[in-house]
């Protein structure tokens, strides 16, 4: 519940539900049949993909796409034969490279099909030098803008935070923005699907740093990390030594402590939580590098 927001769609049992209201002791939901939903998680968040690994993955995708022969109609043009479409395949050099990496024929063929389908859907295969923006409508008629990017959550999460802030400041509504290892998803109300891509996604690097540093204190990540910092520093003592404190009680006490700590400027727990979010979780230097590349044209933004 602590990591959920009004409007989120979740799966519970065999049904999907949309959150309408979150109060102190209950969550009000309504049925949302047929909607794409996420499963409630029962464990802590895992670390996001490292920028270096994401860069290597994007470079590999780019190199493989350069060696891809895309599917095309057969020369006989017979629409009634199974040979009308030639399968996508890699050139000999790329196929041999994949074989040396341990892939068998079926794996190589499936990888070629995957890249071909991606190129068919978006026109460009996302890589370390090409980010792809895709627009579509969801089941409810709202717009989704999907940024395909390989750089990982440590880069995407602060970028998503900045995008959320810009949407609210410039357009006056709260857009739902989600970051994952393979990109960022924006959900916008009907009528806002044609917002300019560059205006939404591109930031001056100093402005970007300032927005993230200012807004991180209001994020769900900050709340969770503050609780962990408070527990480590013994600000959340156990009422019964040796007994486990339920997580909901830890969160309640941490929220009360956070409200009190905000009245004290430069309170050590606040500073440590901000440092942990901005340095240990987020990779702001990498995000600045990417944003500089987008402005310089060394990284392309395709739509």
Question: What does each model-identified segment do?
Answer:
Residues 8, 17-18, 131, 175:
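Residue-level detector of beta-strand structural context in well-folded domains
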Residues 1:
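A contiguous, basic/glycine-rich beta-loop/short-helix subdomain that forms a polymer-engagement track
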Residues 15-22, 66:
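Short beta-strand-centered aromatic/proline hotspots
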Residues 23-40:
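Short, solvent-exposed secondary-structure boundary/capping segments
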Residues 40, 48, 52-71, 75-303:
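Extended, highly charged accessory segments
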């Amino acid at each position: 519940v602590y990591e959920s927001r009004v409007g989120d769609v979740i799966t519970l049992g065999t049904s999907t539900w949309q959150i309408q209201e979150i109060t102190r002791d209950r969550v009000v939901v309504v049925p949302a049949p047929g909607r794409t939903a996420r499963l409630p998680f029962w464990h802590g968040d895992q670390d996001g993909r490292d920028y270096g690994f994401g860069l290597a993955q994007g470079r590999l995708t780019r190199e493989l796409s350069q060696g891809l022969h895309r599917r095309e109609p057969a020369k006989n043009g017979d629409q009634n034969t199974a040979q009308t479409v030639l399968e996508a395949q890699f050139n000999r050099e790329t196929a041999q490279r994949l074989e040396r990496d341990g892939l068998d024929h079926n794996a190589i063929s499936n990888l070629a099909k995957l890249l071909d389908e991606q190129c068919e859907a978006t026109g460009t295969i996302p890589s370390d030098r090409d980010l792809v923006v895709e627009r579509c409508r969801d089941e409810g008629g709202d717009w989704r803008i999907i940024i395909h990017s390989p750089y990982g959550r440590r880069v995407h999460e602060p970028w998503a935070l900045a995008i959320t802030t810009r949407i609210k400041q410039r357009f006056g509504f709260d857009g739902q923005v989600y970051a994952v290892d393979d990109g960022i998803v924006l959900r916008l109300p009907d009528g806002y699907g044609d917002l300019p891509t560059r205006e939404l996604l591109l930031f001056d690097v100093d402005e970007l740093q300032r927005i993230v540093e200012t807004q991180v204190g209001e994020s769900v990540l900050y709340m969770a990390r503050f609780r962990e910092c408070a527990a480590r520093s013994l600000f959340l003592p156990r009422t019964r030594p040796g007994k486990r404190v339920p997580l909901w009680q830890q969160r309640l006490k941490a929220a009360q402590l956070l409200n009190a700590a905000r009245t004290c400027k430069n309170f050590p727990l606040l500073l440590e939580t901000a440092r942990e979010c901005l340095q240990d979780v987020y990779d702001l230097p990498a995000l600045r590098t990417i944003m500089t590349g987008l402005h310089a044209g060394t990284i392309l933004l395709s739509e």
